Amino acid sequence: MNAEEYDRLFRMEDHYWWFVARRELGVEFVRMHVPRHARILDVGCGAGATARDLSPHGRVFACDLSERALTFCRQRGLHALSLGDLQRLPFRTGSVECVVALDVLEHVSDDEQALREIARVLTPNGVLVLSTPAYPLLWSGHDVALHHFRRYRRARLRTLVEQSGFNIVRLSYAVFLLFPFVAIARLVGRLLGGRSRAGLWWIGDGPNRLLLALMRWENRLLRRADLPWGVSLVLVARR
């Protein structure tokens, strides 16, 4: 992401429905599958809200390839920070029990190498918690603006993760309730030749609260069951 996107992330991630719901789901999956006091690595940590919210569960390390992102992390009181690329993580082999990668894999040119690096730094039986955009047909100017390389089909993500040495515990679509609306908006935008810009903007307190309530209801479903389609994919896997 460019500097402007990190600035927007820092301003919005504690309030905007998308960031809050995604982060709460990721943290919940860590609580469900990772013992307390584990060493947790948040890769592609962005402005640091996820790492901050993971801190009560274990010893959290945060890594990003942007120094600007790490500056925002410091403002959130985070100190175990590393500047690094997901394809060449600056961590020892077998040094953490959990890796969290929320909407990161799509930013990496070589996703196979990134998953191998995640497997390398995890201890045996270590846990990966991951989210990533779903359905190539939803590709839009939003993806271009955020420097995505791809969106994933569930079968493709499963194959990639398993070939990297993981056993999949959970693999589900997410943002299920809003999928029809997002799909229509993306397809119409493509037909109209919409320009490349991130589709994240403040929508007002009322709509934001409503969307967050919907996503929290959906997150409760995801604790127990997989969903058949959605804008994103979420995964839990063990090395």
Each model region followed by its residue ranges:
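Conserved N-terminal segment of class I S-adenosyl-L-methionine
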Residues: M1-G94, C98-L102, Q113-L115, L221, ...
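A C-terminal cap/extension of S-adenosyl-L-methionine-dependent methyltransferases
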Residues: L178-R239
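Short, glycine-/aromatic-enriched active-site segment of Class I SAM-dependent methyltransferases
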Residues: F10-E13, L128-R150, R154-E162
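Residues lining the SAM
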Residues: L102-L105, S131
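A structural helix-start
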Residues: A51, V108-E112, T132
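A short glycine-rich, Lys/Arg-flanked "PGG" loop and its adjoining helix->strand segment in the class I
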Residues: E112-V127
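Conserved S-adenosyl-L-methionine
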Residues: F166-F176
